[in-house]
UniProtKB/Swiss-Prot annotation:
Active site residues according to the UniProt entry: 156, 262
Lineage: Eukaryota, Fungi, Dikarya, Ascomycota, Pezizomycotina
Originating species: Aspergillus terreus
Protein name in the entry: Probable endo-1,4-beta-xylanase C
Stated role: Endo-1,4-beta-xylanase involved in the hydrolysis of xylan, a major structural heterogeneous polysaccharide found in plant biomass representing the second most abundant polysaccharide in the biosphere, after cellulose.
Cellular component annotations (GO), alphabetically ordered: extracellular region
Length: 326
């Protein structure tokens, strides 16, 4: 009877501690610690209340990653669904979680054509949109002033040919919306790094990559306070991209830093992941990497199995390969 009681107690303790075992295992080989030892600022991931309140997912975040990006909770539809009526429950959760666990924060995102409430999309008056844009940026950034390392001020504003996307912001304000957004952001939090962020910036000779670099170079020459370019780096398998060369092209625009901001790779091969990590290590202005999620279970590309942990939160070969490479 005593032996059965002891066994039952052991099983109960083991079950209750499953998350902490994961945490202890990963803490011994933290990607963030290894990456920072190479001179970089962070190796991070994204999350929000749903994933961060999953104890197994959270244990890995706490042990392995040094930075957090809100996946959805800071986007316009979440923070200002109706004009002048702000909602910060989800964003507050992430910021408080990050502060409690010593994680840097990348704010994402202030100006984006997608996940944009209809009331914003319907604005046609230049003065009205300017006022709305300034108020939104000011209100969101002011709430988290001093707590956010970097902000994606504008997101996905380029077409694949390197021209500017025809969003409500461009249609009403023209290219000037970029200046308005960055100048407002700088005035609210002068210490935060201000980024422009986009996808398909993975080949140096691609029109979108060159268009981004050329526009940013011009905007900086005009005094627009752009500190960094974020390359989302959502990749297919097989390495038909030149991330290192692309990062160098982006860095040549005159920004003080670049970052890989939303990394995931279809199939999550060890070779592909190590190549991307080495690309950032090889570019002096590349300050960090953010993978777009912890586990395939919660990935927006779950069918592609693109992350470093499988659906059961077990580290993949790519995880171990990165640790070995670092």
């Amino acid at each position: 009877m005593v032996r059965l009681t002891v066994l039952a107690g052991f099983l109960l303790t083991s079950a209750a501690c499953s998350a902490c075992v994961i945490g202890e295992r990963q803490a011994a080989s933290s990607i963030n610690n290894a990456f920072k030892a190479k001179g970089k600022k962070y190796f991070g991931t994204c999350g929000d209340q749903g994933t961060l309140s999953d104890s197994t997912n959270s244990a890995i975040v706490k042990a392995d990653f040094g930075q957090l990006t809100p996946e959805n909770s800071m986007k316009w539809d979440a923070t200002e669904p109706n004009r002048g009526q702000f909602s910060f429950g989800g964003a507050d959760y992430l910021v408080n979680y990050a502060a409690s666990n010593g994680k840097m924060i990348r704010g994402h995102t202030l100006v984006w054509h997608s996940q944009l409430p209809g009331w914003v999309q319907g604005i046609t008056d230049k003065n009205t949109l300017t006022s709305v844009l300034k108020n939104h940026i000011t209100t969101v950034m002011q709430r988290y002033k001093g707590k956010v390392y970097a902000w994606d001020v504008v997101n996905e504003i380029f077409n694949e040919d390197g021209s500017l996307r025809k969003s409500v912001f461009y249609n009403v304000l023209g290219e000037d919306f970029v200046r308005i957004a960055f100048e407002t952001a700088r005035s609210v939090d002068p210490q935060a790094k201000l980024y422009i962020n986009d996808y398909n910036l993975d080949n140096a000779n691609y029109a979108k990559t060159k268009g981004m670099a050329d526009h940013v170079r011009k905007w900086i020459s005009q005094g627009i306070p752009i500190d960094g370019i974020g390359s989302q780096t959502h990749l297919g398998s097989g390495g038909s991209w030149t991330v290192k060369d692309a990062l160098n092209t982006l860095a040549s625009s005159g920004v003080s830093e670049v970052a890989i901001t939303e990394l995931d790779i279809a199939g999550a091969s060890s070779t592909d992941y190590v190549n991307v990590v080495n690309a950032c290590l090889s570019v002096s202005k590349c300050v960090g990497i953010t993978v777009w999620g912890v586990s395939d279970k919660y990935s927006w590309r779950s069918n592609d199995k693109p992350l470093l942990f499988d659906s059961n939160f077990q580290p993949k070969a790519a995880y171990n390969a990165i640790i070995s490479a670092l």
